[in-house]
Amino acid sequence: FAAVSVDCSEYPKPDCTLEYRPLCGSDNKTYANKCNFCNAVVESNGTLTLSHFGKC
């Protein structure tokens, strides 16, 4: 069982696309795509992690 992770090293980005590929964060919030999720990770100073791919 491997931990689920996303590489957010190239974030934050000012604009995210409207692409819908949901990710569920450790805050139990569904993020529309990697960009939205990674921006939130950066904002949280790394406290937010990926729970799983798909909607929460």
From Swiss-Prot:
It comes from the Eukaryota. This is Ovomucoid. Residues 6-56 form the Kazal-like domain. InterPro entries: Bifunctional_prot_inhibitor (IPR051597), Kazal_dom (IPR002350), Kazal_dom_sf (IPR036058), Prot_inh_Kazal-m (IPR001239). It comes from Callipepla squamata castanogastris (Chestnut bellied scaled quail). Disulfide bonds join C8-C38, C16-C35, C24-C56. The record marks L18, E19 as: Reactive bond 3. It is found in: Secreted. Avian ovomucoid consists of three homologous, tandem Kazal family inhibitory domains. Gene3D superfamilies: 3.30.60.30. PROSITE patterns: KAZAL_1, KAZAL_2. GO terms for cellular component: extracellular region. The keyword Secreted applies.
